[in-house]
């Protein structure tokens, strides 16, 4: 898929105020500081489309970007930022859960995982919750350029092994790097193929 246009549409905290219409939505979510904004900018080839920050947990809104006048890329708040107070954590959880459970246009949720880390309990529990609620999702392992030699493959295999303990069938997954654009073609082609099916069935 070639990205010919990408524009910011709206930010809000209320799923009921999200854009109307039938365009499929592909949402991106992950723990704070997983590299979500950098990935979005890399996928869209728009350096400043999603604002990056040195401060984890900065994204606290549902951000809609219209891509190619045919689908929405949705930047969801990050979860699990330790320095956010309990009230703030509860607010973010409500925003995330309301969007995921209520937004009919959401076609696929991309869960971002830092490939440098061992499987984190918060990520595993979140994906388990998605499975329990029948939410279609895929995994994107980020920051692949930060690992040398066979470490990347070993980390991902460890993660898949951990997921296999709870899942009979593993979700699709992608390996990405915002620095060298690894995974860009695969992720965009995946979105394009799903969108074709969506429009074919309308």
Curated annotation (Swiss-Prot):
InterPro entries in the cross-refs: G_ENGB_dom (IPR030393), GTP-bd (IPR006073), GTP-bd_ribosome_bio_YsxC (IPR019987), P-loop_NTPase (IPR027417)
Record has Cell division as a keyword: yes
Biological process (GO), any one: division septum assembly
UniProt keyword annotation of NAD present: no
Keywords of this entry: Cell cycle, Cell division, GTP-binding, Magnesium, Metal-binding, Nucleotide-binding, Septation
Matches recorded under CDD domains: YihA_EngB (cd01876)
Binding site for Mg(2+): 37, 59
Residues reported to bind GTP: 30-37, 57-61, 75-78, 142-145, 173-178
Residue span(s) of domain EngB-type G: 22-197
Recorded GO MF terms: GTP binding; metal ion binding
Gene3D superfamilies: P-loop containing nucleotide triphosphate hydrolases (3.40.50.300)
Family that this chain belongs to: Belongs to the TRAFAC class TrmE-Era-EngA-EngB-Septin-like GTPase superfamily. EngB GTPase family.
Protein name: Probable GTP-binding protein EngB
Organism this protein belongs to: Bacteroides thetaiotaomicron (strain ATCC 29148 / DSM 2079 / JCM 5827 / CCUG 10774 / NCTC 10582 / VPI-5482 / E50)
């Amino acid at each position: 898929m070639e990205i010919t246009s990408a524009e910011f549409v709206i930010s809000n905290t209320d799923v009921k105020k999200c854009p109307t219409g039938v365009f499929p939505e592909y949402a991106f979510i992950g723990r704070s500081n997983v590299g979500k904004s950098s990935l979005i900018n890399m996928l869209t080839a728009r350096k400043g489309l999603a604002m990056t920050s040195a401060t984890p947990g900065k994204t606290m809104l549902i951000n809609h970007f219209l891509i190619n006048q045919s689908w929405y890329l949705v930047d969801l708040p990050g979860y699990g930022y330790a320095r956010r107070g309990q009230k703030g954590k509860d607010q973010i959880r409500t925003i995330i859960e309301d969007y995921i459970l209520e937004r009919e246009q959401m076609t696929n949720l991309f869960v971002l995982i830092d490939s440098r880390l061992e499987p984190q309990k918060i990520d595993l529990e979140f994906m388990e919750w998605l499975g329990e609620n029948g939410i279609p999702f895929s995994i994107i392992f980020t920051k692949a350029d930060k690992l040398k030699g066979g470490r990347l493959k070993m980390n991902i295999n460890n993660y898949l092994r951990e997921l296999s303990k709870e899942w009979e069938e593993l979700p699709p997954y992608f390996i990405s790097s915002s620095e060298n654009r690894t995974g860009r073609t695969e992720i965009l082609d995946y979105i394009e193929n799903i969108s074709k099916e969506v429009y074919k069935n309308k």
